[in-house]
Amino acid sequence: IGARCFYRCEALERVNIPSTVRHVGTYAFNATKLYTNEETDYVYVDSWLVAVKNQELHKTVTKLDLKQGTVGIIDNCFYKAPILEAVQLPDSVRIVGQYAFSGIETLVRFEAGKNLEVLQEGAFANCTGLYVLLLNRSLQEIGAYAFYGCSTLDNNSLDGNSIIPQSVKRIGAYAFMQTMLWGKPENNIIYAGNWVVGFAENAKLGAAELKDSVVGIADNAFFQCGTLTSLKNLSKCAYIGTAAFYECTALETVSLNPRLETVEAYTFYKCKSLFRVSVPTMLRSVGRSAFYGCSNLKTLDFSESAVFASVGDFAFYGCSNLETVTFGENLTGLGRYSFKNCSTLTAVELPDTVTAVPEHAFANCSALVTLKLGSGVTSIGDKAFYKCAGLSEVVLPDSVRTVGKSAFYKCVSLATLTLGNSLERIGDFAFYND
């Protein structure tokens, strides 16, 4: 529910918020009857705390006491509360909104309830006095900048093991930057518990090694680390975040955890030295621009995973040395521009589970000579095989109904074309060759 979503809906007096809602923006219900008719200082909509009606309350409360049954806390709810010292959430709270407790310099202690799932972006940013952090064992996500600028926060242990519970599946970008953790790198790598959250400034990492207990890599953890060439123990990481190795231009090889399910968006973006990637046996998807511009990558075999299903937009765009790709039998989704400008790719074989070849998917794959489309393909998007100059034969299966504009534009070697019996439309310039 976005910021000011129902602002000044003055007749609104009842709302049921479903359990699927994970975010309520600032002022979402202000100036409604829900707000104006509330007689207490805290304004609740269904089970969400959506406002502190009396801002003077911030000047008197040192310990927060929310009612049992509260499910979520709205964005910015206690922003810069001047004397709040401790927060202990009831077990019912699942979600703490963006910057909900940020900027509270007096806050020393935060204790999550048993069912907290998400700390959203900046939830405790710049709480400079925060020292005691007790997170629960069902927490799944710590958002970007969640504890940014908490300058006294250290790696206090949870059960003698880690400040981060084992249940956590994602840590956002710079969640612990400018905390005490940032000043205590281990071999130039910065950890929050058993998670990698960054690297030391001006570090020359080279062939680096993660500690044996490592479980995950946060978003942007090695962002533009131009000296990293390899990373031992990366295969221990069950979670690797968005843009984790963004523009690590010297990174050459990576060995991924066999149980890794997703290569997130921009994970290896423009890692131009990367030439070998192990495909996890449980891999399900590759995100947007995950390997964009990995110009030294030569081969990919997704058939090593029996559950591999989707390739995101721009995922392998500009992998100019990529020669072979094997998709396996369960691919269903192929992204726009996903293999565009893969100029050395020689063969594409799509399984019967693929229903569409989207726009620009294999455009400018000038070395492509073999194309086999599965029997499930119903559409070929605009410029899908644009300027694939090596193609000499194209067979469209009977399932194909539409061929988009310029789909095979300037395929200058094309000599044989077989059209399926279900074809309904061929777009402008589809097979044009000037």
Report the location of each language-model feature.
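Consensus positions within tandem repeat domains that build extended binding/scaffold surfaces
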Residues: 2-7, 26-28, 75-77, 97-100, ...
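Structural signature of tandem-repeat unit edges
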Residues: 9-23, 32-46, 55-72, 81-95, ...
